[in-house]
Amino acid sequence: MNKELKRVSIVVLLMFLALFGSSTVIQVFTADTLRADGRNSRTLYASYSAERGPILVDGQPIAESVPTDDEFKFQRTYTDGPLFAPATGYFTLNQGNTGIEGSLNDYLSGTSNSQFLDQVNALLTGQNPKGAAVELTLDRDIQQAAWDALGDLQGAVIAINPKTGAILAMVSKPTFDPNTLAGHDTDQVIAAYDQLLADPAGPLFNRTLAGNLNPPGSTFKLVVAAAAL
């Protein structure tokens, strides 16, 4: 091999190595970041074109995806949205996900590693992937009772099973309706989000988790007060 061909071969080899290295970096190290980028329309359409798993309370859906005729194929809907908003959070086009919708997004979207076999089956059969259902420990009757007891007051109520630690009620007021943030009209979603964000009452703040907003009441204070009397 003469010197010219040898130089060309080396250059071509270096180009292939550079291409292989860059593709490896993208697919292995930055894939999650790119998928999570809000400007990634491919991921956005893919997440809405799949049937997202329901969120259940007492076996009944409080959040589910229903078929639509537009390009997104499914619409996320919330039953008794304001009542369960502190738990479900919201699933939106461009404002991210919160609550269970965010923390268990991998399961609800069907992309969790534990659902790998389901993903392979969907790929081989050509079927649309489907997310897993998530059952909450909330009790609808206790949740409603906590909601009614709080009334128009600002604050939060949490009821916990002392034996298991299961959360039976999770109410925060003022609250919001996640249905207003789950639409497919981007302008309407942004307007609704900005309005909620600008509300001085802070309906987007989950007071059951944000302890700096409302300090928890101490049951022991009742004992001290009784002793003082």
Regions found by a protein language model. Give the residues of each.
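Extracytoplasmic/periplasmic proteins that interact with beta-lactams or build/remodel peptidoglycan
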Residues: 1-156, 170-213
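Surface-exposed patches in mature extracellular/periplasmic domains of secreted proteins
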Residues: 156-162
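An acidic- and aromatic-residue-enriched active-site/binding cleft used to recognize and process polar
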Residues: 162-163, 172-173, 219
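An amphipathic alpha-helix/helix-turn recognition signal
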Residues: 141, 160, 220-223
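Active-site SXXK
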Residues: 87, 146, 165, 209, ...
